[in-house]
Amino acid sequence: MAHPAQLGFQDAASPIMEELMYFHDHTLMIVFLISSLVLYIISLMLTTELTHTSTMDAQEVETVWTILPAVILILIALPSLRILYMMDEITTPSLTLKTMGHQWYWSYEYTDYESLCFDSYMTPPLELDPGELRLLEVDNRVVLPTEMSIRMLISSEDVLHSWTVPSLGVKTDAIPGRLNQATLMTSRPGIYYGQCSEICGANHSFMPIVLELVPLKHFEEWLLSTL
């Protein structure tokens, strides 16, 4: 989870988030190189008199600055498209979890198990146990197995919401009347926090998300105790 004065991303806990971080670094390096080149040219223009005729009308220069931006855009677009397809592609999910946004809480339904559904409200600050996080804890956590492909079906009962868990690289809009899909897979057990990321009313800030990712054996034990 995030910590005070953090400048970078949260630690990646899913393959998709790892790819997103690599893509961020890749794009940032390209932006840094372009910015450095532009600043270098500006400094030359300010300190040097550019009066040579070849710099005023040069076919080669015009060709370069026409082709080079196209190449740079391709270098950015290709890995971006790859990640988009990774996020959207899911053929045989091990589990399907349906999420509905409400003002101002989330409801969850494990569609593979008929009777397993619950609402998840933020835990009021006065009811927190020692060690729990203010404005991030909920009364019912979502328990899921690790290292398994999980399909998220996300929608809303009232207004626009956005189901977001930064460590897992998941951010999907919850739109009334529309069912959006996301892929979820974690590489290690843990507790992961998220929040609604779409302004949805007065209590928008009080819609936390808590996922508890456990090994498959522990998930099966949780199912037996819950059903």
UniProtKB/Swiss-Prot annotation:
User: Catalyzes what?
Assistant: 4 Fe(II)-[cytochrome c] + O2 + 8 H(+)(in) = 4 Fe(III)-[cytochrome c] + 2 H2O + 4 H(+)(out)
Which E.C. number(s) belong to this protein? 7.1.1.9
Keywords attached to this entry? Copper, Electron transport, Magnesium, Membrane, Metal-binding, Mitochondrion, Mitochondrion inner membrane, Respiratory chain, Translocase, Transmembrane, Transmembrane helix, Transport
Q: What class of enzyme is it?
A: translocase
Cofactor (UniProt): Cu cation
Q: Which residues bind Cu cation A2?
A: 196, 198, 200, 204
Cofactor mode of binding and number, as noted: Binds a dinuclear copper A center per subunit.
Positions that bind Mg(2+): 198
Q: Which InterPro entries match?
A: CcO_II, CcO_II-like_C, CcO_II_C, Copper_CuA, Cupredoxin, Cyt_c_oxidase_su2, Cyt_c_oxidase_su2_TM_dom, Cyt_c_oxidase_su2_TM_sf
Q: Which residues cross the membrane?
A: 15-45, 60-87
GO CC, sorted alphabetically, is:
mitochondrial inner membrane; respiratory chain complex IV
Topology relative to the membrane: Multi-pass membrane protein
Topological domain spans for side Mitochondrial matrix: 46-59
Q: Which NCBIfam families match?
A: CoxB (TIGR02866)
Q: What does this protein do?
A: Component of the cytochrome c oxidase, the last enzyme in the mitochondrial electron transport chain which drives oxidative phosphorylation. The respiratory chain contains 3 multisubunit complexes succinate dehydrogenase (complex II, CII), ubiquinol-cytochrome c oxidoreductase (cytochrome b-c1 complex, complex III, CIII) and cytochrome c oxidase (complex IV, CIV), that cooperate to transfer electrons derived from NADH and succinate to molecular oxygen, creating an electrochemical gradient over the inner membrane that drives transmembrane transport and the ATP synthase.
Stated family: Belongs to the cytochrome c oxidase subunit 2 family.
Name this protein carries in UniProt = Cytochrome c oxidase subunit 2
- Lineage start: Eukaryota, Metazoa, Chordata, Craniata, Vertebrata
Q: Which gene encodes it?
A: MT-CO2
